[in-house]
Amino acid sequence: IRGGKIHVHVIGNSSGKISPKGICGSGIVDLIAELFLEGWIDIRGKFSPEKTNLIQKREGQLCIEYAPGLYFYQKDIDEFILTKAAAHIMVEIMLRESGLELNQADRFYVAGSFGKYVSVESAITIGMYPDMEREKMINAGNSSLEGAQKLLLNKELLADIDQILEEMTYIQFAEVDDFLEQMVAAQALPHTDYKKYPTVMEKLKKRQNICFY
């Protein structure tokens, strides 16, 4: 969002002649992050229609026209916030079960095609990723496919896999005592405990002149 307008990029549109037809997963992360930083949605992810005329009411609910004829609805934001909250608490619970603080983690690996294209800054802004040193965040790409290829070429890696399996800890998140409490806390943008996200608070201060104490 620049100058009160939403600027979009179409994947593979090097000529600039292709109009957007919809929004992808990484685009949703960017959109929600920008809406939040601009103050067009609040900490709960709810639209603030008084902030811009791009927010309007259609089909009985608020939405924003992010491209000509394309709308992102309040229910879309609500549903995605549940997804990002789940991602956040999985990291928190894994760290807790490992007996580690976030600053003790050497690396944060993001695997899969979604992780390959999502903006790290946007994911941190909405609280989907932890707010940590950016150089520690590693895009692992399609690690499952790469691992399968390596195993096909070198069967000796089976011994490494067996060792990893022995060292792994299985966590049933639904059985964690404070899972629901953690889930509710993580549904705020970026989190109910904003001290977990100091760099996001700094961005808000610069974009909206908001101070947190």
What are these model-derived regions, one by one?
Residues 1-213:
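Helical "lid/coupling" subdomains associated with nucleotide-phosphate turnover
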